[in-house]
């Protein structure tokens, strides 16, 4: 399993200390998924209460990237559930950060992937509208997430850098 053999994610505290330019997310997120620490290049989506583009993204090879989903902060439905967490893990995504909610928490927690979201919510999102934007900068939790930049998450928080830190 490539996810389990990947090198350990650097500590956000070390990354933040060594990189004064690092952006640090406001501490708004709950941790889900079987991995509490994850990092990788960013892929971005902006959607609202429709997870069609989220599904389309996690069906693609993740190649160790982290999918950052700006769901507008909506807590009225979940954008990621157990099925999408399984797809993301199977397709090599390192993690998912959701400015919104998730569901099927037990299923997500059973997957070898890191997930951050604002909350859990039992209602599923709309499907099929395919509305949203892919690959654009998204802004939430006091941070600008740009496609191809680098994100690191662990129990201390979420840090964003222009590129992977020197090891």
Residue spans of the language-model regions?
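Short, charged beta-turn/beta-strand-edge "cap" motif at the junction between a beta-strand
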Residues: 144, 157-159
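Feature captures the catalytic cores and cofactor-binding loops of soluble hydro-lyases/lyases
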Residues: 3-147, 164-167
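A generic "binding-loop/recognition-motif" signal
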Residues: 84, 156-157
């Amino acid at each position: 399993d490539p996810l389990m053999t990947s090198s350990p994610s650097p500590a956000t505290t070390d990354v933040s200390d060594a990189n004064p330019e690092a952006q640090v997310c406001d501490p708004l997120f709950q941790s889900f998924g079987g991995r509490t620490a994850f990092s990788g290049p960013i892929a971005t989506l902006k959607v609202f209460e429709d997870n069609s583009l989220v599904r389309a993204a996690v069906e693609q090879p993740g190649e160790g990237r982290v999918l950052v989903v700006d769901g507008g902060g909506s807590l009225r439905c979940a954008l990621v559930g157990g099925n999408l967490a399984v797809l993301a893990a199977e397709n090599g995504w390192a993690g998912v950060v959701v400015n919104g909610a998730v569901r099927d928490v037990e299923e997500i927690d059973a997957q070898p992937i890191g997930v951050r979201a604002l909350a859990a919510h039992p209602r599923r999102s709309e499907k099929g509208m395919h509305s949203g934007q892919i690959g654009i900068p998204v802004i939430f939790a006091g941070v600008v997430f740009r496609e191809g930049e680098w994100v690191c998450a662990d129990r201390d928080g979420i840090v964003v850098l222009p590129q992977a830190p020197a090891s």
